[in-house]
């Protein structure tokens, strides 16, 4: 009789543990799905912000403006951006600006200063240094290439 009570108790205990396990697993699945949904929404938001920034590359983009668009603090914004795109917003922006500048210098007869302004660089000396560092020659030298 004592053994019977222990077996009944064990089955009840096992059943309770199994129920608890199922409840915990169910909650975990729901929170994971919600997390994926919010990650997906956040990724979509960042894709829109990135598209806006890269489409309007000639405009001055500040960290504050980008953070406000995402409604995030600076560190959160940069962390998310890096996770989604494996880069920083300013690196993406400057890379696109540089490609546009190389294209304009190669295909248009424009002064270097005008190319810099058209590509969103407000400072000619910064543009020239950045261009030389990344292309191995000055913008003027690039424009004279055959």
Over which residues does each language-model region extend?
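Short, solvent-exposed positions on alpha-helices
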Residues: 8-16
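Terminal helix-turn-helix DNA-binding modules in bacterial transcription factors
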Residues: 51, 55, 60-65, 82-125, ...
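Helix-turn-helix
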Residues: 65-74, 78
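Linker/hinge segments immediately adjacent to helix-turn-helix/homeobox DNA-binding domains
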Residues: 19-35, 79
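Short, Lys/Arg-enriched anionic-surface-contact patches
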Residues: 37-44, 87-93
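Short, small-residue-biased leader/transition segments that mark boundaries at the very start
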Residues: 3-4
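Core residues of bacterial helix-turn-helix
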Residues: 70, 119-120, 131
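Short hydrophobic/aromatic patch on the recognition helix
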Residues: 76-81, 126-127, 131
């Amino acid at each position: 009789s004592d053994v019977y009570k222990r077996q009944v108790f064990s089955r009840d205990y096992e059943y309770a543990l199994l129920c608890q396990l199922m409840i915990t697993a169910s909650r975990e699945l729901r929170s994971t799905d919600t997390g994926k949904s919010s990650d997906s929404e956040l990724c979509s938001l960042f894709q829109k912000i990135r598209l806006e920034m890269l489409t309007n590359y000639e405009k001055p983009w500040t960290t504050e403006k980008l953070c406000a668009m995402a409604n995030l603090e600076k560190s959160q914004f940069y962390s998310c951006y890096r996770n989604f795109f494996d880069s920083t917003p300013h690196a993406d922006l400057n890379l696109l600006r540089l490609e546009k500048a190389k294209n304009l210098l190669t295909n248009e007869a424009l002064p270097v200063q005008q190319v810099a302004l058209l590509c969103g660089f407000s400072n000619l000396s910064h543009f020239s240094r950045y261009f030389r560092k990344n292309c191995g020659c000055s913008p003027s030298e690039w424009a004279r290439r055959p």
